[in-house]
From Swiss-Prot:
Effect of residue 144 to A: Loss of enzymatic activity against both acetylated and trifluoroacetylated lysine substrates
Keyword set, alphabetical order: Hydrolase, Metal-binding, Zinc
Cofactor(s), names only, from the UniProt record: Zn(2+)
EC number of the protein: 3.5.1.-
Subunit structure and binding partners: Homotetramer; dimer of head-to-head dimers.
Consequences of knocking out this gene: Growth of a mutant strain lacking this gene in the presence of both acetylcadaverine and acetylputrescine is comparable to growth of the wild-type. The deletion mutant strain shows a 25% increase in biofilm biomass after 24 hours of incubation compared to wild-type cells.
Annotated site residues (Polarizes the scissile carbonyl of the substrate) in this chain: 313
Residue sites binding Zn(2+) per the record: 181, 183, 269
One Pfam assignment: Hist_deacetyl
Biotechnology: Could be a suitable photopharmacological target for photopharmacological antimicrobial chemotherapy using photoswitchable inhibitors.
Protein name: Histone deacetylase-like amidohydrolase
GO BP, sorted A to Z: epigenetic regulation of gene expression
Length: 380
């Protein structure tokens, strides 16, 4: 079944520059200048995704849109004024370090506002009934950003800013955020840790970023207790680990919460060739997770689903993973075939690893008080 999928993109988002880096290391001292892309959070992963959509013909089947930048009113619902002022001043001065692993260049402030604006508009389009679902190709990403501190290539909390705008404009009460970026969604967690109107679920590589963080015991506080679920997965985990996490934790949690809107923080850095992680997913892993969460949205949220782009640092492979997600959202299949899918499938963990990971997931599900998921059927 084909669906009305809106795709939010603006070329200016690709113009954010982090300055001279080799992967994530500032050039200087013992760090040599890079021969190619430079900083890991390069525009090329997003540019090549958009190019693959265009060349495959899929763009023509989507509602291609841009959006205005996030307003001060939008941003101030999440970020204090002094943070906006500090960010703008550093950007206007030519850039520098805004926080841990958060370098910016000239114009980054305005581009980050636009990135958040794309996410806001994506939620607006779905909640207004203009699209069945939406994908926001936001850059810079947002899920590590704290209210008053940039972190991990993130400068505004794009998804939180969009959710708070949606609450103000559309009166939506219950929103679920599923973060499958390989790095923990610590910014989203911090913003909603004491609230029960947003369910935050993070699937991430155990101990990857923030360095050493697992988070399984961090389930929220006060009214938010039980509404923050962290699912740390063992390094080296692959397709089976994520399918088990979806079936055993994510889907039952959505069933219990019954959101009116689901937002996915979609990083593609759990893919098997990403330079900043050690997981083993291929494009069909992201396709399968999208199908699961889409069916959950149709069951609980009237189909209202928005996917917001986060990380993913393999220029060669991110486009195939992103294409798979957008094909699944839209119900339109292109002629593109993933050239690494079968190779990655052969590298999947052995049975002993899979059994150990499954046991850990069972223990987490019991800790979270979750019953096994029933098979989801799309709403008719």
């Amino acid at each position: 079944m084909t669906r009305r999928t809106a795709f939010f993109f603006d070329e200016l988002c690709l113009w954010h520059a982090a300055g001279p880096h080799a992967l994530t290391l500032p050039v200087g001292g013992w760090v040599q200048p890079p021969a190619a892309a430079g900083h890991a959070e390069s525009p090329e992963t997003k540019r090549r995704l958009k190019s693959l959509l265009d060349v495959s013909g899929l763009t023509a089947r989507l509602q291609l849109r841009s959006a205005p930048p996030a307003s001060d009113e939008d941003l101030l619902r999440v970020h204090p004024a002094h943070y906006l002022e500090r960010f703008k001043a550093l950007s206007d001065a030519g850039g520098g370090s805004l926080g841990q692993d958060a370098p910016i260049g000239p114009g980054s402030y305005e581009i980050a506002r636009l990135s958040a604006g794309l996410a806001i508009a994506a939620l607006d389009a779905v909640l207004a009934g203009e699209a069945d679902n939406a994908y926001s190709l936001s850059r810079p990403p947002g899920h590590h950003c704290l209210p008053d501190q940039a972190m991990g290539f993130c400068f505004f909390a794009n998804i939180a800013v969009a959710i708070e705008a949606a609450k103000a404009r559309h009166g939506v009460e219950r929103v679920a955020v599923l973060d499958w970026d390989v790095h923990h969604g610590n910014g989203t967690q911090a913003i909603y840790y004491r609230r029960d109107d947003v369910l935050s679920i993070s699937l991430h590589q155990d101990g990857c970023f923030p360095p050493g963080y697992s988070g399984a015991e961090d389930i929220g506080e006060d009214r938010g207790r039980g509404f923050n679920l962290n699912v740390p997965l063992l390094p080296g985990g692959g397709h089976d680990a994520y399918m088990q996490a979806m079936q055993r934790i994510v889907l039952p949690a959505l069933e219990r919460f019954r959101p009116q809107l689901i937002v996915v923080a979609s990083g593609f850095d759990a893919n098997a060739v990403d330079p900043l992680a050690r997981m083993q997913l291929h494009s069909d892993s992201f396709r399968a997770m999208t199908a699961m969460v889409r069916d959950a949205a149709e069951r609980h949220a009237g189909g209202r689903l928005v996917v917001v782009h986060e990380g993913g640092y393999s220029e060669a492979y991110v486009p195939f993973c992103g294409l798979a997600v957008i094909e699944e959202l839209s119900g339109v299949r292109s002629a593109v075939r993933d050239p690494l899918r079968d190779f990655i499938e052969l590298q999947q963990p052995n049975a002993a690893f899979r059994d150990f990971q499954r046991q850990r997931l069972e223990e987490l599900a019991a800790q979270f008080g979750l019953c096994p998921a029933q098979p989801l059927q799309a709403a008719r």
